[in-house]
């Protein structure tokens, strides 16, 4: 597996009920979050994200995915999984604006692993508290479709929203 470069892109192919909703293409912030970029691209190249879902969607805020537990039909476990390790925070000056890719974590700053979120609106209250490590270059319309889906009381979409992530140079 190759090291990510300035030209590295990720494509998240999103589907629901067997129909493709579209693609979200990401570029990375190597300069401010190299560890997070390397972690995300490594997991994607290993196929870790394939078959996981966007398990948390909050209109006016973000869509969250990357949890291996989201492959389990039991939604109670969604949002609790990771890759089996944690990575050190790389808080930086990139603002959490619409389209920014950032790592989800627990209350512990150094607890990120595989779960990530894409802001669908500006969320400056997250600045310097969560690691922004990329941004959407195309496909925000797909993120908007996902965040607009009907959801349960835990902000889990009622229809499964599955992803496949590929890395290109």
Task: Please state what every model-predicted region is.
Residues 1-169:
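Cyclophilin-like peptidyl-prolyl cis-trans isomerases
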């Amino acid at each position: 597996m190759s090291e990510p470069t300035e030209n590295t892109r990720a494509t998240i192919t999103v589907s629901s009920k067997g129909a493709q909703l579209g693609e979200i293409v990401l570029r990375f912030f190597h300069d401010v979050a190299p560890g997070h970029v390397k972690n995300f691209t490594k997991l994607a190249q290993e196929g870790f994200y394939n078959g996981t879902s966007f398990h948390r969607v909050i209109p006016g805020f973000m869509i969250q995915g990357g949890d291996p537990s989201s492959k389990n039909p039991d939604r109670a476990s969604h949002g609790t999984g990771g890759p089996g390790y944690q990575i050190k925070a790389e808080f930086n000056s990139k603002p959490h604006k619409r389209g920014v890719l950032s790592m989800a974590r627990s209350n512990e700053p150094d607890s990120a692993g595989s779960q990530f979120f894409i802001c669908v609106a500006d969320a400056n209250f997250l600045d310097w508290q969560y690691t922004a490590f990329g941004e959407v270059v195309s496909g925000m319309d797909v993120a908007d479709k996902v965040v607009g889906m009907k959801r349960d009381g835990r902000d889990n979409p009622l229809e499964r929203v599955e992803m496949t992530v590929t890395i290109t140079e």
